[in-house]
Amino acid sequence: MKTGSVEAGEQASEDATPRRGKKLNRGILILDLVLRVFGAICTLGSAVAMGTTSQTLPSSSQFFRFRAKYNDLPMFMFFAIANSIVCAYLVLSLRLSIFHIIRSAGIITRIILVTFDMVMLVLLTCGASAATSIVYLAHKGNASANWLPFCVRFSHFCNRISGSLIGSFFSIIIFMLLVILSAVSQFSICN
């Protein structure tokens, strides 16, 4: 039976819960900062790899030159621009992420940040999916449309654009983790 006073064990567990929640929230915010840095590196690498991709085939004739550049296809240009925009956003959002670590009370700015995270996730996914369809056609071709695969001849070009896609898909996974971390962080603040 309980008496009027609170037992020592119950009081200690009640005091430990807010501290544990603050430490968990601070850990989530630090992980958010680290993921933003890695996401910026991945998107910057993808944009640079795509933007500097070109290959010219050697030819025996002076009149014919076969060249493949990323800006020959609008999907690759959209991919490079989308990755550049997302990289700029991630660099700019680092300031807010550091602010949240220092002052964890900024709920409105967290909601704004997760909203922009979702918008950037959609933009990055659109760019990566558009470029993926063209990379698939470059590697496999399409027999019914009589499109031959050109990665047999432009292997360096195709390797660079494929590597660029890998970096972009890593960034998509990072953005998914950022949105999940934001939801967990909001839940821990509310409770």
From Swiss-Prot:
Keyword Glycoprotein annotated: yes
Subcellular localization: Cell membrane
UniProt keyword terms in alphabetical order: Cell membrane, Cell wall biogenesis/degradation, Glycoprotein, Membrane, Transmembrane, Transmembrane helix
Sites carrying sugar chains: 142
The keyword Transferase belongs to this UniProt entry's keyword annotation: no
Stretches of the chain found on the membrane's Cytoplasmic side: 1-27, 94-110, 182-191
Membrane topology, from the record: Multi-pass membrane protein
GO cellular component: plasma membrane
Biological processes per GO annotation: cell wall modification; cell-cell junction assembly
Residues in the Extracellular compartment per record: 49-72, 132-160
Chain segments annotated as transmembrane: 28-48, 73-93, 111-131, 161-181
Domain of life: Eukaryota
Xref: PANTHER family: CASP-LIKE PROTEIN (PTHR36488:SF12), CASP-LIKE PROTEIN 1U1 (PTHR36488)
Task of the protein: Regulates membrane-cell wall junctions and localized cell wall deposition. Required for establishment of the Casparian strip membrane domain (CSD) and the subsequent formation of Casparian strips, a cell wall modification of the root endodermis that determines an apoplastic barrier between the intraorganismal apoplasm and the extraorganismal apoplasm and prevents lateral diffusion.
Subunit structure: Homodimer and heterodimers.
Family listed: Belongs to the Casparian strip membrane proteins (CASP) family.
Name of the protein this chain belongs to: Casparian strip membrane protein 4
Protein's organism: Ricinus communis
